[in-house]
């Protein structure tokens, strides 16, 4: 399951990722509908979801701030919102790397991804 941060909803990323990702692609607001979700509430929501990979551009609040957990993966994309359309390709490249190829390999990891490095 791929879970998009709510700040990525207006970019059409769900459909772009769903073109190549075989599992569920959703957003964080679907995990707790009709509520405001603070950044602090996201890890507990991810723990309750089935093997999620959370995708965000909010590097400041998630990279090296959230404690890794074997029940989820967080992919922090260090790209400005004006380049959010690059995220599906970067995510696909991330999933091609050995430590991220399968759910079981990526769970428990928090990655910071840019155009140049993971």
Which residue stretches match the model-derived regions?
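Acidic, PIN/NYN-like endoribonuclease modules and their adjacent C-terminal/linker elements
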Residues: 1-6, 10-21, 40, 62-118
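Proline-centered flexible-loop/turn and helix-kink motifs
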Residues: 21-22, 50
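A short beta-strand-loop structural module common to alpha/beta enzyme folds
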Residues: 23-33
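Conserved beta-strand termini and adjacent loop/short-helix elements that scaffold enzyme active sites
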Residues: 28-30, 57, 77, 113
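Short helix-initiation/N-cap motifs at beta->coil->alpha
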Residues: 32-41
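Acidic, metal-binding active-site segment of PIN/NYN-like and related structure-specific nucleases
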Residues: 39, 46-68
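Surface-exposed alpha-helical segments enriched in charged/polar residues
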Residues: 44-47, 96
